[in-house]
Amino acid sequence: MRFMAGPAGSQSLGPLCFHSSPQALYTVLLIVLVMMSLVFGKFVPVNWEPPQPLPFPKYLRCYRCLLETKELGCLLGSDICLTPAGSSCITLHKKNSSGSDVMVSDCRSKEQMSDCSNTRTSPVSGFWIFSQYCFLDFCNDPQNRGLYTP
């Protein structure tokens, strides 16, 4: 290894071969930023494809109870039923003028939805039937029923 003697050997290249201190500061700042992004940053690839729509559920899940009152809850057949997409959940209210309200909750297919939100008289004298449909999972269960009441 040879050493240079004379004026060329004593001449310093300066801090990292920079000719001015602002250039050195910018370079140090750039190095710090790159190091911080490598240490703390995460590489997230860019997806240029349009987002795919969420898959439509195959079945609607509904609450099923064959005999229910507000005071006592479900008395007969508490269960879950599945119905194809496009169908609905239903709650039938059988009421009379004294305030009695007996309910039946179930699934209803598209073909059976002709009486949607319909009030009609019952075969039992003094009672009428009100049907209430909804189209979200478990929208007819007792906790959610009030949220979907028109």
Curated annotation (Swiss-Prot):
Tissue occurrence: Detected in T-cell lines and fetal and adult lung.
GO molecular function: identical protein binding
Gene Ontology CC: external side of plasma membrane; extracellular region; protein-containing complex
Location of this chain's protein in the cell: Secreted
Keywords associated with the record: Disulfide bond, Glycoprotein, Secreted, Signal
Domain UPAR/Ly6: 60-150
Pfam family, one: UPAR_LY6
Sites where a glycan is attached: N96
Record's comment on post-translational modification: N-glycosylated.
Cysteine disulfide partners in this protein: C62-C89, C65-C74, C81-C107, C134-C139
Subunit structure: Forms oligomers.
Listed name of the protein: Lymphocyte antigen 6 complex locus protein G5c
Species annotation: Homo sapiens
